[in-house]
Design a protein with these regions (language model features):
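Extended, small/polar residue-biased N-terminal targeting/export presequences
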Residues: 2-65, 111-115, 119-139, 364-370, ...
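Conserved functional hotspot residues or short segments at active or partner-binding sites
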Residues: 295, 299-409
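Cleft-lining beta-strand/loop regions that shape enzyme active-site pockets
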Residues: 3-12, 65-69, 73-82, 87-284
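Residue-level signal for tight coil/turn positions that link beta-strands
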Residues: 61, 146-147, 293
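Short acidic, Pro/Gly- and aromatic-enriched capping/linker segments at domain boundaries
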Residues: 283-294
Length: 409
């Protein structure tokens, strides 16, 4: 038949893929069809190594939006910022491309060049030339601040994150004896998330017991819960978690778990609000389906979806006058078309600023955390007050079924 001939020569196959992807993206912004190449790319990225520019992107109004550049990659070195809109890749418009197609165009052989056109609020579009490189993501960066504070920066949650974190904590403890170490800063700012199991094991590194996160699907029986195992790697030392509007998904699970258990004080500004679970369904050689199947809930039963995590200590990062036009408003998950609702009768909120200064002397969030840990500044929210009774955190209320989508991305 004509249909069979079309499929065998590839045209029908492409049409079917486009149709499937169109149906999936109409469900919510995070559901999509991954062809074989993009499925392989996704697997490579979760392993923490791939070739490309080093940016986490999403799609908004047909344009590619930067969620966050990854530290020490060609994109971050070229000055790409969170919330930049990529309109052209090598002089070809991205309008009409799927997110996966645009990502595919941005990847390529190590050493090859690419020009991307970027729109920023208050500025004329600019072309930025970048040389592709082998992206090996250091999931955790660490250092000792002034011989008494352990600083842990988690850039994303890939398969190496928890092991990287364990090693970093061991190195800090070896360099700073227990009586000298005053506490830890866990920096999750502009961390776009990643693997659920890694967010659970990272949370577990700071907890002795209790629920870390639960996921709940459309039906109540589709609930799953994950609990901490004994063994706090930081030995109960005070912890301050830093978040901002670029902290999403797995980052929000960690911040929410440590906040609910009063294990850490969360400082910064409201997080992104991506509180949904994506399940990957492999389709053999054809690729895979990525489907949103559940929402995340913190131990106390809070839905993260389209709401985000509110810090215990709200502290805005001052943006220099000359950069204000470049740092546009961040609407977060609630600003994405067709996003899943929170599943609770609560108002949706936009996220907050994603700006983080390059120089630590200008970083009021890190510097305030250091002052709190050293006792040179005080705040009633630090250290967090323990719960009055060691009770099991409340279970999340049964969420309403997701609303039927009325718009598509």
């Amino acid at each position: 038949s004509a249909t069979r001939r079309a499929w065998s020569d590839g045209s029908g196959q492409d049409q079917s893929r486009h149709a499937i992807n169109g149906m999936l993206t109409s469900l919510d912004p995070h559901s999509s069809f991954l062809d074989a190449r993009n499925f392989r790319d996704m697997q490579v990225q979760t392993r923490g190594e791939f070739g490309g520019l080093g940016i986490e992107v999403t799609q908004e109004d047909g344009q590619i939006k930067v969620v966050a550049p990854i530290d020490d990659t060609p994109a971050s070195k070229a000055g790409i910022l969170a919330n930049d809109l990529i309109t052209h890749i090598d002089n070809e418009p991205v309008q009409g491309l799927t997110l996966q197609q645009a990502v595919e165009k941005m990847r390529g052989p190590v050493g090859s060049g690419i020009v991307i056109r970027v729109n920023r609020t208050g500025q004329n579009p600019q072309d930025i030339r970048i040389t592709r490189d082998r992206i090996v993501i250091r999931a955790v960066r660490s250092r000792i601040e002034g011989e008494d504070i352990g600083y842990l920066r988690v850039t994303q949650f890939n398969e190496q994150t928890t092991e990287n974190l364990r090693r970093a904590i061991e190195e800090i403890r070896a360099k700073a004896p227990g009586d000298q170490l005053k506490g830890y800063i866990l920096d999750l700012r502009n961390n776009p998330g990643g693997l659920l199991d890694q967010s659970i094991s990272v949370s577990d590194a700071f907890l002795e017991r209790g629920e870390i996160v639960s996921t709940r699907g459309r039906n109540a029986e589709e609930t799953q819960r994950w609990n901490a195992r004994a063994g706090d790697l930081t030995q109960g030392k005070p912890v301050i978690v830093l978040i901002n509007g670029g902290s999403a998904s797995a980052s929000e699970i960690v911040a929410g778990a440590l906040q609910d258990h009063r294990r850490a004080t969360v400082l910064g500004t409201r997080s992104f609000g991506k509180g949904s679970v994506q399940t990957i369904i492999p389709l053999g050689s054809q690729g895979a389906l990525r489907l949103t199947t559940a929402r995340y809930y913190t131990p106390s039963g809070r839905s993260i979806q389209a709401r985000g995590i509110d810090p215990d200590i709200v502290l805005e990062q001052p943006v220099p006058e000359e950069l204000r036009a470049r740092v546009s408003e961040n609407r977060g998950e609630a600003g994405l078309r067709g996003h899943l609702n929170s599943g609770q009768q609560q108002e949706e909120r936009s996220a907050s600023s994603v700006y983080v200064p390059r120089e630590q002397k200008d970083d009021v969030q890190i510097n305030t955390a250091l002052e709190l840990l050293r006792g040179t500044k005080t705040d009633p929210k630090f250290p967090p007050q323990p719960r009055r009774a060691e009770a099991t955190p409340a279970s999340p209320a049964t969420p309403a079924a997701p609303a039927a989508p009325t718009t598509r991305q």
